[in-house]
Every structure is written in C-alpha cells, then in structure tokens.
C-alpha cells in the first residue's frame, strides 16, 4: 500500500555497465562502445516490468531499436519527483576518448587531464531530458522537489579492492562527461531539488560543486 519507484539499471538488462546512446545496438558485451548488447525486446520487457506503474513518459516516441523512454515526474505527499534516465542517452567511451587505463571506462593515471575526456559532442542526459527538467523545475506547486536517478553525478567510489587499484575516473559514473554533469546539476539546483541515486554500492552523502569543487 506504499508507492514504489523502480529504475532499471545496467545489471537489470544484462550489462555490467550501460551507456545507452539513445537505444542503439552495442557490438560489445561490456557495452562500452555505447548502446544495448542484448535483444531490444528483452530490454523493453525489463523496462515494462519495472516502470509500467509510473506516470506516462514525458517523451512518447520510440528511440533506436524501438526502445522507449520512461523518464517522467510523480507527485506524492507534497513531494514532486523527477524520475530521469541517466544511462539511456549517455555516450559510451570506447573509440570516442583517449584510453588512459586498463579499460575504456577506467582511468588510473593520476596525471590525466580531465579536459581530454570532456569533449563537447559527448552526451549525458541529452536535450530531451534537459527540456523535461527545465519544465519540471519551473513548477513550484509542491512543497519539495527531488530527482531520482540510477547513479550519482560524481565518481563517489574510487577503490576497487586494493589501494593500488584506485580509479582517478570511472566513466560509468555520471561525473562524466563533465559538461553534461554540470548541466544536470545546474538544472537540479535551479529546481531547488535534492538528488537521490543508487549504484555506487556504499551509502554516501555528497555536496556537489559546479564552478568549484
């Protein structure tokens, strides 16, 4: 008898990580070239199972391979929730940025230049969700606003086991691409919203910066 919001994440559709690139087909099982590796009907089935109870999606037209968007808003008990898809439109790193670690999405060089991977053509949320958040943020009819997403807008977890395995950038996190991350946080800030996300394995409270860190 309690409302429940579920957001499909990478493991739900059979991938270790997901950079959806608007629903395109990935040619790699690890998915880091961007897109979905498994059959689109399977992807759509998973998303129906986990999001069919949500309000109608903001964007109704199908994306690539017929995969649909589900990002939407939901008002419960005086709180206006924006439910966004931070994986579905995101660019995959493989072949788009210089490789600086053991994997296309892992950078372990402490001297790397963040601007070398912050390329303007790379996408995080994309124009459709920027438009949605602009409109949602301008509605002040609720007591409180909150944004829900699959993962956070930073690399909150840096260690994968030993200290020698520290990642200086994990491109699965929404800290990348940085310009997309900054745009998302700017829209969340303008809305006066808090942000609640999953995925990073460790409970973390983060105070984000946009101009200063």
Task: Annotate each predicted stretch with a short phrase.
Residues 1-213:
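Long, structured stretches of catalytic cores involved in phosphate-ester chemistry, encompassing
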């Amino acid at each position: 008898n309690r409302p429940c919001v579920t957001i499909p994440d990478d493991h739900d559709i059979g991938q270790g990580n997901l950079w959806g690139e608007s629903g395109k087909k990935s040619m790699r099982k690890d998915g880091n070239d961007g897109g979905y590796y498994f059959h689109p009907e399977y992807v759509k089935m998973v998303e129906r199972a986990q999001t069919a109870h949500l309000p109608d999606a903001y964007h109704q037209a199908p994306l690539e391979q017929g995969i649909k968007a589900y990002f939407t808003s939901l008002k419960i008990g005086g709180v206006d929730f924006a439910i966004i898809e931070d994986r579905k439109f995101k660019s995959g790193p493989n072949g788009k940025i210089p490789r600086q670690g053991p994997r296309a999405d892992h950078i372990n060089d402490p001297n790397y230049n963040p601007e070398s991977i912050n390329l303007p053509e790379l996408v995080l949320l994309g124009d459709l969700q920027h438009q949605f958040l602009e409109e949602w943020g301008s509605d002040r009819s609720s007591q409180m606003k909150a944004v829900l997403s699959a993962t956070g807008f930073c690399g909150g977890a840096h260690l994968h086991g030993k200290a020698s395995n520290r990642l200086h950038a994990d491109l699965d996190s929404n800290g990348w691409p940085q310009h997309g991350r900054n745009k998302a946080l700017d829209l969340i800030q303008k809305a006066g919203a808090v942000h609640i996300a999953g995925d990073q394995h460790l409970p973390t409270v983060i105070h984000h910066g946009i101009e200063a860190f």
